[in-house]
Amino acid sequence: MTSAINEYFDQAQLSMAAYAAGLVVEMNMGENRDAYEDALRGGGMSNAQATRFAAEYSIVSTTYIDISGLAVNVFRDNETGQIVLAIRGTNDVLDILSNAELYFGGITRPQTVSLYNYVQRLLTPAGQLAPQVIDAPPYSGTGSGIYAAPAVLGLGYLSGASGVTVTGHSLGGHLSAVASRLFPSLIQSTYTYNAPGFNLPVADALLDQFPGDAGAFPSNITNVVADTGVTVISNVGDLPGTPKRIFIEDQSLITNFPGNHGIAPLTDALAIYNLFATIDPTGTIERVTEILKASATTDKKTLETALDSLRTLFQENYAFGSP
């Protein structure tokens, strides 16, 4: 039995995998598997995480990066066939500029346009023309400026697809919510991790200009946020959906940038939540959080102490505090 907590952990790992660069379909097989795992480690995964992830997920399309800074990886769950769009968060100067636009303008326009255009290419069969748009003057209102652009050849990787999951951390989570708004017939589930929100009137005014079946943000967006210390970015704007607050070990912004905002501390914490949920699928986030907070007197040892306690209960001949 899979619980919601198990799913939050799985999607956190996929959000981390969005930071892997240079993925190509050929990495799924043979000797190229090592390159796949190396790319995942470059995105922040541990050796064990990378090996397990590469065994569980296949690469659907080459890593997409464009001039706006948008970066997307597309994966397929080898067991269920589930397709996942994993959108990268802030990673370079272009993303920093997009973040600045988001904070002051309520939504990141260039990457929103790039995301729409890329998904249209994924949906359009290879060899056929995919509709594209451009954001250009003259602007007649707060969110206008979206016009038809010359069509380009489709990629076809998601031709005929539905029930797709989209996930992302930080700016990637913000864009995941955008994808769910622009492509409601394609996207079934949306997960965001420490993602900034929107100035909703400004965002709606922009997104309403896009062609297609865009209507409103869905209500089933799941927003997973670190509930420890200072997490400024996830408090920006309004993010539609349901927040899920996860207790993490408090991170130093100086010695472990970007501190509590990073995807790694959140994924590490969710690994412990996932372990508890695997033992008891009826457990809730709130209950696991209570256990973790009671596990140690210092945030720095909370996860280790909780894991040691479980090992003491379930692992034969385990001495508390052993590696």
Predicted regions, residues:
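Short, solvent-exposed loop/turn elements at domain surfaces
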Residues: 23-25, 93-94, 231-234
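Serine hydrolase/lipase
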Residues: 79-82, 117, 121-124, 135, ...
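Flexible, membrane-associating and regulatory peripheral segments of lipid-active enzymes
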Residues: 1-87, 285, 289-290, 294, ...
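Conserved short loop/turn motifs at secondary-structure junctions
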Residues: 29-31, 163-167
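Gly/Ala-rich beta-loop-alpha elbow adjacent to hydrolase catalytic centers
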Residues: 167-172, 176
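A conserved cap/lid and substrate-binding interface adjacent to the catalytic center
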Residues: 37-164, 182-189, 194, 198-200, ...
